[in-house]
Amino acid sequence: MKTLRFPAGLYGITPEWDDTDRLLAAVRAAAAGGMTALQLRRKLADERLRAAQARALAPLCRELGVVFLVNDHWKLALDVGADGAHLGRDDADPATVRAQAGAGLLLGVSCYNDLRRADALLAAGADYVAFGTVFASPTKPEAVHAPLQTLTEARARLLACPAPRPAVVAIGGITPANVSQVAQAGADSAAVISGLFEAPDIQAAARACAAAFSVNP
C-alpha cells in the first residue's frame, strides 16, 4: 500500500542554469543516482525560459520515473503536465489552488520553522510540508533556521494521518555529508540544490543522498 502522498528520498531542486541541455543532462545523472522527485525553481529566469525548461523537463521526468513539480507557477505546472507545484508564503493560496486545480495536482508548501503554518496548510490540502533551512544555505543565506527537532515534531504529527499521509520535506544546506541527519530526525525527503547539482559527480551525490532514506522507514 502507498504510504506517502509524495515520494520519499532525494528531491532535487534545479539550480539557476539557463543552459537547458546542461540541466537535462544533470537531471538524468541525478535520476540515475536515485533522485525520486524534481522541482523546477527558476526565480531569476524570464517567463519564456522558465516555460521552455518546464516543457523540456516534464516529459524527461516521466521517462525517468521522477515526480516533477514547478515552483510558484502552478498554472504552468498544469500547462506542461507536471505532477505538482510548490508554493511559498508569497505565492498563491494553497486552498485556492487546490480548489481550482483539483485533487490530481500534488501541492507542496514552505513552512519554514512554523508547525502551526504546517497544520493550516495540511488542512488546506497540502501533500507535503517543507521545513528549512535546516543547515546554512548558500542559496538563501538569510533564511529562517528550522532546527532538526522541527522535523521530528512534524513527523510525529503526520504519523497519525491515514495512509497515504503527507510527507515531511527538509530543505536548506543539505549535502551528502549531512543528509543522514535530516533522515534520522524524521524527514521523509530532502530537497537539495547545490549539494546535488554543484557536486563534481552528480550521480554519486544523488546516490549518497538517496541512501540516507533507504534505512529510514
From Swiss-Prot:
<dbReference type="GO" id="GO:0000287">
    <property type="term" value="F:magnesium ion binding"/>
</dbReference>
<feature type="binding site">
    <location>
        <position position="173"/>
    </location>
    <ligand>
        <name>2-[(2R,5Z)-2-carboxy-4-methylthiazol-5(2H)-ylidene]ethyl phosphate</name>
    </ligand>
</feature>
<dbReference type="GO" id="GO:0009229">
    <property type="term" value="P:thiamine diphosphate biosynthetic process"/>
</dbReference>
<dbReference type="InterPro" id="IPR013785">
    <property type="entry name" value="Aldolase_TIM"/>
</dbReference>
<feature type="binding site">
    <location>
        <position position="91"/>
    </location>
    <ligand>
        <name>Mg(2+)</name>
    </ligand>
</feature>
<dbReference type="GO" id="GO:0009228">
    <property type="term" value="P:thiamine biosynthetic process"/>
</dbReference>
<keyword id="KW-0460">Magnesium</keyword>
<dbReference type="GO" id="GO:0004789">
    <property type="term" value="F:thiamine-phosphate diphosphorylase activity"/>
</dbReference>
<feature type="binding site">
    <location>
        <position position="110"/>
    </location>
    <ligand>
        <name>4-amino-2-methyl-5-(diphosphooxymethyl)pyrimidine</name>
    </ligand>
</feature>
<dbReference type="Pfam" id="PF02581">
    <property type="entry name" value="TMP-TENI"/>
</dbReference>
<keyword id="KW-0808">Transferase</keyword>
<dbReference type="GO" id="GO:0005737">
    <property type="term" value="C:cytoplasm"/>
</dbReference>
<dbReference type="InterPro" id="IPR022998">
    <property type="entry name" value="ThiamineP_synth_TenI"/>
</dbReference>
<comment type="pathway">
    <text>Cofactor biosynthesis; thiamine diphosphate biosynthesis; thiamine phosphate from 4-amino-2-methyl-5-diphosphomethylpyrimidine and 4-methyl-5-(2-phosphoethyl)-thiazole: step 1/1.</text>
</comment>
<feature type="binding site">
    <location>
        <begin position="39"/>
        <end position="43"/>
    </location>
    <ligand>
        <name>4-amino-2-methyl-5-(diphosphooxymethyl)pyrimidine</name>
    </ligand>
</feature>
<feature type="binding site">
    <location>
        <position position="71"/>
    </location>
    <ligand>
        <name>4-amino-2-methyl-5-(diphosphooxymethyl)pyrimidine</name>
    </ligand>
</feature>
<keyword id="KW-0479">Metal-binding</keyword>
<feature type="binding site">
    <location>
        <position position="72"/>
    </location>
    <ligand>
        <name>Mg(2+)</name>
    </ligand>
</feature>
<feature type="binding site">
    <location>
        <begin position="137"/>
        <end position="139"/>
    </location>
    <ligand>
        <name>2-[(2R,5Z)-2-carboxy-4-methylthiazol-5(2H)-ylidene]ethyl phosphate</name>
    </ligand>
</feature>
<keyword id="KW-0784">Thiamine biosynthesis</keyword>
<comment type="similarity">
    <text>Belongs to the thiamine-phosphate synthase family.</text>
</comment>
<feature type="binding site">
    <location>
        <begin position="193"/>
        <end position="194"/>
    </location>
    <ligand>
        <name>2-[(2R,5Z)-2-carboxy-4-methylthiazol-5(2H)-ylidene]ethyl phosphate</name>
    </ligand>
</feature>
<feature type="binding site">
    <location>
        <position position="140"/>
    </location>
    <ligand>
        <name>4-amino-2-methyl-5-(diphosphooxymethyl)pyrimidine</name>
    </ligand>
</feature>
<comment type="function">
    <text>Condenses 4-methyl-5-(beta-hydroxyethyl)thiazole monophosphate (THZ-P) and 2-methyl-4-amino-5-hydroxymethyl pyrimidine pyrophosphate (HMP-PP) to form thiamine monophosphate (TMP).</text>
</comment>
<protein>
    <recommendedName>
        <fullName>Thiamine-phosphate synthase</fullName>
        <ecNumber>2.5.1.3</ecNumber>
    </recommendedName>
</protein>
<dbReference type="InterPro" id="IPR036206">
    <property type="entry name" value="ThiamineP_synth_sf"/>
</dbReference>
<dbReference type="InterPro" id="IPR034291">
    <property type="entry name" value="TMP_synthase"/>
</dbReference>
